[in-house]
Amino acid sequence: MGRMHAPGKGISQSALPYRRSVPTWLKLGPDDVKEQIYKLAKKGLTPSQIGVILRDSHGVAQTRHVAGNKILRILKAKGLAPTIPEDLYFLIKKAVAIRKHLERNRKDKDSKFRLILVESRIHRLARYYKTRKVLPPVWKYESATASALVA
């Protein structure tokens, strides 16, 4: 899928493994994988970071095939899921960083423009998550309280 505010076409993507069965050489069972997920989530890692660690350190290509569920669903069942979705969280974090930069460099017009683009992406994504009932309907992004969300 193409980028929203950039000229890139975004053709590159990772390929999913063809076989959906669990590899025979994998020593971890479904319960072991879930325990690893819980342990890493309690350390404060995001679901994508957990997936990368499971892939690189433990050889779990797709958690869904081994454990029977996606990482975020496993975390939701245990009550360890993040309050706001990961992609929205990182957009808010980026907006806070740009605002902090603009406090020091008031004349930076390009950063001011990029902040507008990032915040429009935040509003669009928040609207999507409200319709999917991931966020509460009264949730609103405000730049004044944004730094408290990502701290």
UniProtKB/Swiss-Prot annotation:
InterPro entries: Ribosomal_uS15 (IPR000589), Ribosomal_uS15_arc_euk (IPR023029), Ribosomal_uS15_N (IPR012606), uS15_NS1_RNA-bd_sf (IPR009068). GO terms for biological process: translation. Belongs to the universal ribosomal protein uS15 family. GO terms for cellular component: cytosolic small ribosomal subunit; nucleolus. Keywords: Ribonucleoprotein, Ribosomal protein. GO terms for molecular function: small ribosomal subunit rRNA binding; structural constituent of ribosome. SUPFAM superfamilies: S15/NS1 RNA-binding domain (SSF47060). SMART domains: Ribosomal_S13_N, Ribosomal_S15. PROSITE patterns: RIBOSOMAL_S15 (PS00362). This is Small ribosomal subunit protein uS15. Gene3D superfamilies: 4.10.860.130, S15/NS1, RNA-binding.
